[in-house]
Amino acid sequence: MRTKKAFLLLTFNVLIYLAACQETERILANNGTEDNEITTSKGVSPNTNPLFLSNSTAGLYDSKGRIRLTIGHIGAIGALRNDVKILEVSHKALQAEGILDDDLDVEIISQTGCGESYEGVAVAADMYHLQKVKAFIGPYCNAEMDAVARMAAFWNIPIIGYMAASNNLADKNAYPTLARISLRTTNSIAEATCAMLRHYGWNKVAIITNTGILAYDRVLSFEEVFHQRGINVVKKIMFDEFADSKAMIASGLLNDIKNSARIVVCLFSNTRESSREFLTAANTQGMNVNEYGYVFPWLQDGGKDASPWTGADGSMLQKVKDQYANAIIIDDVNSFDNTIVGPFIERIKDVGLTEADVDIANIYGYLYLFDALKLYAIAARKVLNETGKAENLLNGRMMWQNMRKLKFVGMVGASGIASGQVSMDDRAERAPLYRGFFVSPNSDSVLPMVHMEPTMLDNCDGIANKSGCYEIVVTDIMRDFWPSVDRKMPKDEPDCGYRNERCDYTLIIIGAALILLFIVAAVSAFFAQKILEKRALDKLPFRIYRDDLQFIDEEQLKSMLSLGSTRTKMSNMNYGSRNHAIVGTNTHAIYHKYVQRRPIVFNRADKTLIQLMKAAVHDNINPFLGMVWNEREEMLLVWKFCSRGTLQDIIYNESIQLDTKFHGAFIRDILAGLEYLHASQIGYHGSLTPWSCLIDRNWMIKLTDYGIADPLERWEKSQSISRDGLTSDDDKSQATQATSILYESPEMLKNREKNRVRRVDQDWMRQTQTRRQLGDVYAFGLVMYEIIFRALPFPEGTNQSELVEWLRDGSKVVKPTIPQNKVLNMDLSALIQDCWNTTPEMRPSLRRIKLNVETYLNIKGSLVDQMTRMMEQYANNLEKLVAERTGMLEEANQRADRLLSQLLPAYVANELKLGRPVPPKTFTSSTVLFSDIVGFTEMCQNASPLEVVAVLNGIFDGFDQFIARKDAYKVETIGDAYMVVSGVPEENGHRHINEIASIALDVHKFLSEFIVPHKRDTKVQCRLGFHTGPVAAAVVGLNAPRYCLFGDTVNMASRMESNSEPGKTQISETAKNLLLKEYPDYICEQRGEIPIKGKGLCMTYWLMGTKSEGSGRSGAYLAPSMKSAGTGFTGMLGNSANDYSLNLKNPTGLQR
């Protein structure tokens, strides 16, 4: 309604404008006449009325008299960049082809319209009246094309549409001068759609659309064509214009499609977005199945959008494409490829344009614009050539008549592109050229399915019958492509109707009921059989339920093996991590675990065999306790536990010495077990190996794994069980099983290979019981050789893995042999080789083997007696070893005690050894002595580090020797400093002052005789000082503990030493008083008061010596007087033969 109102208002304004312009022209013309006559007329004929005449021939010729036609191009705001350049390309092409030349040429005036205010209509009026255009190309949009086409018809000038696609514009009674060059008009794509529907026999369709004027016009166009061609629209469903998939589902309208149609034609305003939402809804409702066909005439206004499953960056959106699976899209033949882009870019290079200068997404707009100008020029040349009158070029109807059924090559037609060939129909509309594309779910690109091309009809008037006078011929490109069972296209209506009302299902119901009854009966019988079998299996004596097993972990097993006093270390050898469990209350068992993949089915022979295994009782047969199966996807074979492991463990344990008695006892026990099995209903062992021979606590061999070999192999072949569950510690592991092939006789290997290649449904090839027993003899020969020589009977250096592979694939024949370097009784050697005979019948019987073995191995007595003697010898050796190790321990303890007593006081060391703490202790009276070597720094500078260390070792070793003879304790040495205490850690009354004083005198005497090795002319002097008083003592530190002294007495003693003089001993007044009081034999000389740090002025004394030494005793030491005291090393030179010298080879010791 808005468009019609605007058109009427604009037309009224234009008519007023035209009348005013015509009146002005008439007055001006009359004023210019010679007699100034004004002519009037009471009536105006259609040929002279300005409302029915084209503008005059003025402006038709240029100044040189050549025809120049002015064409007005009305584009769109914001669409088709550089569209004027495209017209320029077309103009150049027309000149190059000779259609336009000097006598006929065109001038193009280009302006834009298609805005919100219908600017294009005003532009058309302006072009016609003021710029004197003779034809129009455009406008771009439908609304303005409707108005301008009517005005052009009114003015009788040709107008060519190149983008407007409305079906209304095909009415030539309303638009008699309008030709359209666009390939994608609504009426043409409707014709193509109708042709494809009829091609597949789809005469009943539903139309899906949405609200809005554009969708409404499209539906009207399609309904009109469908009605003309006999296509029945059974249902028309309309969604809201902007409805999404959820809203479509919520509306419930999709159910109407299910109940009324199977072929759906989708016509939306926004084809790209709305179609995607609709298919999403259809998929959600389960309507995207093979019996539905969705047809999408790809109608778009303006430029061509990318496919719905193409993202903004050009990538494919797979989920969106999956929604379009099995959809059919009708579009231009080059819609889904870029074949037209290359030729188009080549054509626009003539005017300096590149791909970046145009809107490639709207490439069809450029092509149609080029073709529109060419259509007009060809028609103009045709009119001019046929009539020879230039004024006929202004006759719009005549020009339109010459555009009908016109064919020419379009912009890209020269490149062989089908859509580049222009063919006009009988209404001057471009004949449709389309394809149907199938969106395959199995291909990344769409697949062309049909080609639709028009064929013009003869003797047809398109104006009279309102058609283009052509018939669309549909050609199959693909056949049998629909993803249904029969590969055929779906039908437009189900065979049985939408509600199955056309089919009689009585017979089908009866048949289905019978089949269902049969299935129920079969299933019931199957489950009844399973229940009966389960009850029968539940009653089998060898069945053990998994809940009846108490599994034992490694820690529990160690605890159990340590309980019995009769068990030895050999009792639990190699059994610390195997599979152990308790069956019932207290039966210790081991189990082999197999992964169960399918339920195990026992046949009668299996049940009989396993029951016989369960009932087997013999001293040399290990009891079979039972099986666990069909529980937790695993099968367990449970055997009684033997505490000393397997025969293999004993054979290859080098710490165990085996003599001929062991050999004979083991071989005798194995033979006894085999004799019992061969005489029983079990009949054979079947898998005799060293690890299937267990040893109990009494060193008796017990055979295990007997009889079960055949069922295990058959169950593994049928994939009921797998050995993947066997751990590496299990003696039935895959590695062990691989090695077991060495113990199988050649005929057994051949039989196994035959069974391996047989199908599961074929019968299992069994060996006779006799052959099985002879196979045991072959394995016994290998085990007997292994017992005697603790090795396999193959040459040394043979790779066991390669040997196993050779035997498995049969690529190389390897026979066991006795190496020449093995010493063995000739008769026994011949017996073993007879057991290995490749001809089973040539092997000896068990009775013959038993007689020969007893003779050759001289088996007497029991193995228990041999073990008793061996244990006695072992106990004697153990007592001797314990005595030796005890002596070594005592010696190590003594060395540790001596070292500890040197590091700590004996009392403290004893307390620490006993683990008792040593608390700090205060001593009320003790004497602390400090000494320091004079000039030690200078000595270090003038000597090497090793020489300095040698001097210190010599001095301090001498100090240590005579301190050791005193009741004193060396606290520590720090560099050249030496600290001694007496009265600590053991109190000794007042005797400590005498001990320290005598030590001080001995030190001076020792140094007076000491010779520096590397400087024999140098004498060593030291300063000494001591003080008497209370101290505190404690052990400090957990790592490397030290016995330390604390208190003011220690500090005062240190001050006495630091303020002393070389070669002298300074003592405090307290020490002098106690010394002279208790021991008056000592001589002390007053030094006087000197400043002491932290004490002020203190009276100190020199210790000069003893009276007994001063009376002339040989070697007596007397301190020099203060006047003659020296301060260096040179004051005291000793030339006596008793001088001490340092032994550099033993720097810690002194030699005289």
Curated annotation (Swiss-Prot):
Gene3D superfamilies, sorted: 3.40.50.2300, Nucleotide cyclase, Transferase(Phosphotransferase) domain 1
Regulation of catalytic or functional activity: Inhibited by chloride with an IC(50) of 60 mM.
UniProt-recorded name of the protein: Receptor-type guanylate cyclase gcy-8
Localization per record: Cell membrane; Cell projection, Cilium
GO CC annotations, alphabetized: cilium; microvillus membrane; neuron projection terminus; plasma membrane
Gene: gcy-8
Spans through the membrane: 507-527
Domain Guanylate cyclase: 927-1057
Stretches of the chain forming a coiled coil according to its record: 861-899
Keyword Metal-binding on entry: yes
Recorded domain comment: The protein kinase domain is predicted to be catalytically inactive. Might be required for the negative regulation of the guanylate cyclase domain.
Extracellular compartment residues: 22-506
Species this chain originates from: Caenorhabditis elegans
Keyword line: ATP-binding, Cell membrane, Cell projection, cGMP biosynthesis, Coiled coil, Glycoprotein, GTP-binding, Lyase, Magnesium, Membrane, Metal-binding, Nucleotide-binding, Receptor, Signal, Transmembrane, Transmembrane helix
Biological processes annotated in GO: cGMP biosynthetic process; detection of temperature stimulus; intracellular signal transduction; microvillus organization; receptor guanylyl cyclase signaling pathway; thermosensory behavior; thermotaxis
Glycosylation sites: N31, N55, N385, N465
Region forming the signal peptide: 1-21
PANTHER family, alphabetized: GUANYLYL CYCLASE, RECEPTOR-TYPE GUANYLATE CYCLASE GCY-8
Function per UniProt: Guanylate cyclase involved in the production of the second messenger cGMP. Regulates thermotaxis responses in AFD sensory neurons. May regulate AFD neuronal activity such as calcium responses to temperature gradients. Maintains the microvilli receptive ending morphology of the AFD thermosensory neurons by regulating cGMP levels downstream of kcc-3. cGMP levels antagonize the actin cytoskeleton regulator wsp-1.
GO MF terms, alphabetically ordered: ATP binding; GTP binding; guanylate cyclase activity; metal ion binding; peptide receptor activity; protein kinase activity
Binding sites annotated in the UniProt record for ATP: M573, N574, Y575, G576, S577, R578, N579, H580, A581, K593
Binding annotation for Mg(2+) 1: D932, D976
Sequence ranges on the Cytoplasmic membrane side: 528-1152
Catalytic activity entry: GTP = 3',5'-cyclic GMP + diphosphate
Record-listed E.C. numbers: 4.6.1.2
